[in-house]
Amino acid sequence: MNKILIIDDDRELCALIKRSVQSEHIEADFCNTGKEGLQKLKEQEYQLVVLDVMMPGMDGFETLEEIRKENSLPILMFTSKNDSISKVRGLRAGADDYLTKPFDMDELIARIASLIRRYTRFNQQIGAVQKLDFDGLQIDLENRSVTTSNGTFELPPKEFDLLLYLSLIHI
């Protein structure tokens, strides 16, 4: 069963989202601070994070930055700010999707399901392959590194996943 982590300081909203995704056979944990969320991500495996921007202490952007240092799972951000600057900042920092509060719960659930579907399908495709070889380029899936004639490189998680995705389309 797929499992998501909801990080938001609004406990009632977390409980509502948890109940809503459970009706779609998706398990959910929630926590109310960015630090708690980072700890849960170290302890358990999730297929998606739902992350609020406006939280006391470590805000959603800082939390997103920390998550992206270690993890490439999909992240859906939301906020009550309805300005394009926040949306663009979140997407550029590594969020996969962005919703503005108030949002329609059915739309949120559909976006969550869509992101999980793409993530799990992508991981199933690469699960059987250890290395991809192209003319002058080798992608090592086990070590998450890229080798060219100029040497071996470790890319940030999002960039590695994008390169891998584009390579799989090429095959």
Map each language-model feature to its residues.
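Active-site beta3 strand of CheY-like receiver
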Residues: 44-50
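Charged docking surfaces used in two-component/phosphorelay signaling
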Residues: 15-23
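Basic, amphipathic DNA-recognition helix from helix-turn-helix-like DNA-binding domains
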Residues: 65, 69, 74-133
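Short, Lys/Arg-enriched segments at the junction into DNA-binding effector domains
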Residues: 3, 114-160, 164-168
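Conserved sequence signature across two-component system core domains
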Residues: 7-8, 31, 49, 99
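Acidic catalytic/metal-coordinating carboxylates
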Residues: 32-36, 59-62, 86
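Receiver (REC) domain active-site loop signature in two-component systems and cognate sites
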Residues: 55
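Short hydrophobic/Thr-rich beta-strand motif most characteristic of the beta2 strand and flanking loop
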Residues: 25-32, 40
